[in-house]
Amino acid sequence: MNKARRIVNLADVPLKDNGDGKSFKAQVGRVGPMLGLTGLGCTLTVVPAGKRAYPFHRHHVFSELFYILSGSGEVRLDDRTLPVRAGDLIASPAGAEAHQIVNTGKDELRYLAISDMATVDVIDYPDSKKMGVAAGVKNGDLSTATYKAFGRVTPADYFDGEEPVQQPAAKLGTGSR
């Protein structure tokens, strides 16, 4: 039987530094595993003033829901920028608008990121023209992926470079079969 707690106070969630320390800076705490959740992710995200936790991106496999706990900022949704504040819910369905939450306020911005827990995802980053693919992800933590690749894609036809490989002829043995 799973002995995970069923109630967690957000003040008790351990936080880890995340980001590049420049434009992207946050502390994140994985709440879902603390609660024993496997099909639903929940992460506490704390973003200092003037920063953002993640690049502008779109998930093609899983949906996210953000709940602003405290502070204020803006959310980019494709070509729109909208103000957000404590109490707001932001929906990001799989394959919908690219999104990014930015702390434009004076105080830290705290929010919960809730998602369905796909073990595979395809992510695109419109600002940098990158794509990402991840597989074998555990508890929504990309660092656990058994395969991940991030880069820029050069368009190619599906069959481009896929010439049949000649297999060497089988050698006949002298033993019994």
What are these regions (language model features)?
Residues M1-G39, D124-R177:
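A short, N-terminal "cap"/entry segment at the start of jelly-roll beta-barrel domains
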Residues K25-R30, T43-H59, A94:
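Conserved short histidine dyad/triad with adjacent acidic residue
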Residues L44-A49, H59-R76, I114-A118:
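Short, conserved beta-strand element in jelly-roll/cupin
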Residues L65, S72-E74, T81, A98, ...:
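Structural motif
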Residues D79-A96:
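Short acidic-glycine-tyrosine-enriched beta hairpin
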Residues A94-D121:
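Ligand-binding loop in jelly-roll beta-barrel domains
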